[in-house]
Amino acid sequence: MDKSKIRNFSIIAHIDHGKSTLADRILELTNTVEKREMQDQLLDSMDIERERGITIKLNSVQLKYHSKDDKDYIFNLIDTPGHVDFTYEVSRSLAACEGAILVVDASQGVEAQTLANVYLAIDSNLEIIPVINKIDLPSADVDKVKQEIEEIIGLDCSNAPLISAKTGLNVQDVLQAIVDKIPPPSDAIDNAPLKALIFDSYYDKYLGVVMSIRLKQGMLKVGDKIKLMSTNAEYEVTSLGIKTPKIVKKDFLEAGEVGWVAASIKTIKDVNVGDTITSVLNPAKEPLDGYKKLKPMVYCGIYPIDTNKYQDFKEALEKIELSDSSLVYEPETSQALGFGFRCGFLGLLHMEVIQERLEREYNLELIATAPSVVYKVHLTNKQVIELDNPALLPEAQKISKIEEPFVEIKIATPSEYIGDLMNLCQNKLGIYKNMEVIDNNRRILIYQMPLAEIIFDFFNKLKSISKGYASFEYELIGYKESKLVRMDIKLNGEMVDAFSMIVNQKFAYQRGSALTLKLKELIPRQNFEVPVQATIGNKVISRETIKAYRKDVTWKLHAADKSRRKKLLEKQKEGKKKMKEIGTVEVPQEAFVAILKIDD
C-alpha cells in the first residue's frame, strides 16, 4: 500500500458545534454510505448519543476519496467523544492520527471544551485544520470567529473552509484540505517490530473483544501471536480488518493503517485503552507513550426500587460492562435501600449515561445515592486509605488528615455573567487563578476547586446563572488537604446510612439544616413524634421534628369528667412512648432524591 495516500484524522468540537453532522456529510460525499442507509449522527450508535447530541463511544471508519488531482486517497476518520469525562479516550484517539479538523460554530465561537480538545491535539503534534460551521445561520459572525481562533488558539484562518455541515455547503473544501494539509503517516515502517496503539475496544458476541488499533510500525496477520505490553498477556489473532463503517475482514494490516483486531479475548477488562500491541516472536523494546490506567473519579450507590429486581440489575451491569471497561462496581447493602451496587464512573456525564442506559435498555427503576469522590484518608497509625463511601469513614480521633481531589476549571462565558459566576466559584471553595480575554464580550475564568463541589450541582447552577451561555471543562491537578467531616442523618435516633456524606466543615451546618428541613417536609407524619437530626460524631448540628398524628381519645367524654380524661391521655402517652421505641420510620423515595438537590 502507498503510505503517502493515507490520511488519519479526527474531528474535534465543542458539544453542538456540528461534529457528528460534518462526519455524516463526509461519509455521504465519499460514497462510503449509500443514501438509503444514511441516518443522522451515523457514527453515534447509542440512542442516548443521538438524543443528547453527544458522542460517548469512539468510532472509526475508512473512506475512499478521489481528489482534484485525480488521485485516490484513503481517509481514516477516528471519531472522538467531546465531553470532559472522556478526555483520556480523546487523547488516545488523537494519538492515532496525524491531523485534526477543528469545527467551530459561526454563531457561538470558541468554547471551553473546544480549547480543551485543541490543547490535546497540540500536545499530540497534530496538524489542525480550522473549519467554521453553520455559516448559513442568521446569527453567524464568521469574521469574529476567525479572529477568535487566530487570537486564542493561534491558528491561521485565512484559508479556513466556511461550511454548513447541515446542507453540505463547501464540505468538499474540507476533504481537499485533508489531502493538502494533513501529512501521511511518517513513521510507518513495515519491517520494524510490531507496535499498534489500542485506541478503543468493544465486545462482540461472536468475536469476543474487538480492539480498534492504529498500526504505528510492523505488520499484523491472522494467526500472529501478539502480546499486550501493559499486562504481558499473550493471544493469537483470529481475525482483523477495517470498518467502512461495516466490519470488513482482511488477511493483514500494514503500518500506517487503522483497523480492528480480534484475538478470542473473553472480557473487556483484559484490554486497556492506550496499551500497545506487539509481536511475541519479535517484540518491541518500548511501548508507545501516553498509556495510563483509567481510574473512576466519581462513585455512588445505585439500588433497584423493586428489591426483587436485584438479579436483573446485576445482569444489566454485567452486560453494560462488556462495552464499557471504565465502569467499575461491587455489591453493597444499605439498611435503608437494601441490596445494590457501589459504582465508579469517569465523571458526572458518564454516571448519568450509565444510569439512563440501565433504566432504558433494561427496564429498571433505580435510585442513586449522592455522588462522592475518592478521598485519601491519613490515619494516626500512618496508614493511608482510599475511600469513596462516606459511611465507611473511620472515627475522627483515628484520622490525622483527609485529602480530596482538586481540579482546575476553565469557564468560557459572556462578560455580563462574570460577577455571578465568580460568586458561584467562591461559594464552591474555588481559588481564583486567572482571567483570559476571548474578545470584547467573552472571557475565560480559571479557578482551582475541589472536585466534590463540581459533581454536586455546579453544572446546573452555571447554566442557570449564564442562561445557558457559559461552558466549562476541568482537569484533575492532584490531591490537597481539606477540613472535611462526615455528616450523618438520624431518624428517630437511628442512622440512615444512605444519607451520610463527607462535607467541608464550612458547609456542614448549612447542608445539615437544609437536609433536615427537606426531610421534615418529605417524610410522612407517624403516630409518634420523629426527631430528624444531622450529626457530626456525637454532636447534633441541626434538628427538626416531624409532629405525630394525634387521635382524639376524649371525644366521647363529658366535659366535666376531668379525671377520666386525664387517665385516657396518660394511657395514650404511654402507648406513643412504647410505639416510638419499637417503631420504624418509612422513608419515601423522594427523600433520597432530595439529598441530591439540597444546595438548590
UniProtKB/Swiss-Prot annotation:
EC number: 3.6.5.n1
Membrane topology (UniProt): Peripheral membrane protein
Enzyme class, UniProt record, top EC level: hydrolase
GO cellular component, one term: plasma membrane
Record-linked InterPro entries: EF-4 (IPR006297), EFG_III/V (IPR035647), EFG_V-like (IPR000640), EFTu-like_2 (IPR004161), G_TR_CS (IPR031157), LepA_C_sf (IPR038363), LepA_CTD (IPR013842), LepA_IV (IPR035654)
SUPFAM superfamilies for the chain: EF-G C-terminal domain-like (SSF54980), P-loop containing nucleoside triphosphate hydrolases (SSF52540), Translation proteins (SSF50447)
Ubl conjugation found in the keyword field: no
Main location: membrane
All residue ranges annotated as the tr-type G domain in the record: 4-186
Binding site for GTP: 16-21, 133-136
A Pfam family of this chain: GTP_EFTU
Assigned keywords, A-Z: Cell membrane, GTP-binding, Hydrolase, Membrane, Nucleotide-binding, Protein biosynthesis
A GO BP annotation: positive regulation of translation
Location in the cell: Cell membrane
Purpose: Required for accurate and efficient protein synthesis under certain stress conditions. May act as a fidelity factor of the translation reaction, by catalyzing a one-codon backward translocation of tRNAs on improperly translocated ribosomes. Back-translocation proceeds from a post-translocation (POST) complex to a pre-translocation (PRE) complex, thus giving elongation factor G a second chance to translocate the tRNAs correctly. Binds to ribosomes in a GTP-dependent manner.
Similarity-based family: Belongs to the TRAFAC class translation factor GTPase superfamily. Classic translation factor GTPase family. LepA subfamily.
Protein's UniProt name: Elongation factor 4
Organism listed in the record: Mycoplasma capricolum subsp. capricolum (strain California kid / ATCC 27343 / NCTC 10154)
